[in-house]
UniProtKB/Swiss-Prot annotation:
Residues 1-24 form the signal peptide. Belongs to the chlamydial CPn_1058/CT_355/TC_0634 family. One of its GO terms (molecular function) is peptidyl-prolyl cis-trans isomerase activity. SUPFAM superfamilies: Triger factor/SurA peptide-binding domain-like (SSF109998). This is Uncharacterized protein TC_0634. Keywords: Signal.
Length: 353
């Protein structure tokens, strides 16, 4: 259950739409103000973005989300200042952008009168953390209201994103697009070879004996069509050697190492299926090729759902970018704002104690 909760909270970082305005806006938060909480983080709280006349994004908003993410992913390290130091420093840029995304989408949702029932928010909080929220007060100086605000904003952002992106994507993916993509996959597959093979290792007391045994193994495999590992091993053992047989490999061209591909291509298949012995530190190697054929795909009926899902993912990126650009235009977002906030010359937003 804890793993599921961690994944659920970590998924908040998947929202990658970011924008905002008024870099350095002071509002009612002096840039010199300093708040310290039990997490070992000194927060230089100030307004980072002004969304509208009623809504601003502050350093504390970002820290609150960092606190929730840290506790969700690393509860066993909640009292480790060094662990938080590493986590907060690494995650700050990503979480900063995600919080700005959420504020902008929440503002958009408000305009469109899209709301989340408080009961749903409380249920989500309980599903993630249980009913005991005291660790947030003890280690992060966060109230239940602070937690509610973060989770509520995330859920609102997810809902509006679903309406503005996912619903449009579903309408765009047509049966014709699926068929065209399948045909393209078929054409690509026809250019790919698929190799089915094993690698045999022959060991013996001397190099001469090993080569002699390897020659007999090669001869036997090239004479018949049957594959009998046990009989082959018995034959090698009777000659004073040892046979080690790999599992059966099924590999496409791109999945083959250069050495394996070279060895397989030297086999005169299908007239032969076992190549010449190759010297190796672990013993003599014999490559046994069972099949080399053009890659084939399953029927469209079996791949349709998979192809449709892939197309939706691709179109979602496009729709998300469109939605992002509209939000930027509406709220006057300048991409350089994020760069300024994260630059080395920018005023510190928080300090690790």
């Amino acid at each position: 259950m804890r793993v599921v909760k961690r994944i659920a909270v970590a998924c908040y970082l998947g929202i990658t739409i970011f924008s905002g305005i008024a870099f350095g806006y002071e509002g009612s938060f002096p840039s010199s103000s300093l708040e310290q909480n039990p997490s070992g983080v000194a927060i230089h709280n100030r307004v980072l973005f002004k969304i509208d006349e009623d809504t601003v994004v502050t350093t504390l908003d970002v820290i609150h989300k960092l606190n929730i993410l840290f506790y969700s992913t690393c509860p066993q390290l909640v009292d480790s200042v060094s662990a938080r130091s590493q986590y907060y420093s690494a995650m700050w840029p990503v979480v900063l952008e995600s919080v700005i995304n959420e504020f902008l989408m929440a503002a958009d949702a408000k305009e469109k009168k899209i709301f989340i029932d408080p009961t749903s928010v409380n249920q989500e909080i309980e599903a993630m953390f249980g009913r005991d929220l005291s660790p947030f007060a003890k280690f992060f100086d966060m109230t239940p209201g602070d937690i509610f605000n973060v989770v509520h904003r995330v859920l609102v952002a997810q809902r509006i994103e679903g309406m503005m992106v996912r619903s449009r994507v579903m309408l765009k993916v047509t049966p014709g697009m699926v068929r065209d993509r399948y045909q393209k996959l078929v054409e690509d597959a026809s250019q790919v070879s698929q190799w089915t093979y094993r690698v045999l290792t022959i060991k013996a007391g001397s190099e001469l004996l090993a080569n002699k045994i390897a020659g007999k193994v090669q001869e036997r495999l090239n004479e018949g069509d049957s594959w009998d590992k046990e009989r082959l091993a018995a034959m090698v053992l009777s000659q004073g050697g040892q046979l080690i047989c790999s599992d059966e490999f099924i590999r496409e061209d791109a999945q083959l190492s250069a050495a394996h591909k070279k060895a397989l291509e030297e086999i005169n298949f299908p007239e032969e299926r076992c190549g010449k012995a190759l010297e190796h530190a672990s013993g003599l190697k014999l490559f046994v090729l069972f099949d080399c054929s053009t890659k084939t795909l399953e029927p469209l009926e079996k791949m349709e759902a998979q192809i449709k899902q892939r197309l939706m993912m691709e179109l979602a990126e496009e729709e998300e970018a469109n939605y992002k650009n509209k939000l930027r235009a509406r709220y006057g977002f300048d991409p350089s704002i994020i760069t300024q906030l994260l630059s080395e010359d920018a005023p510190q937003l928080f300090s690790l104690l």
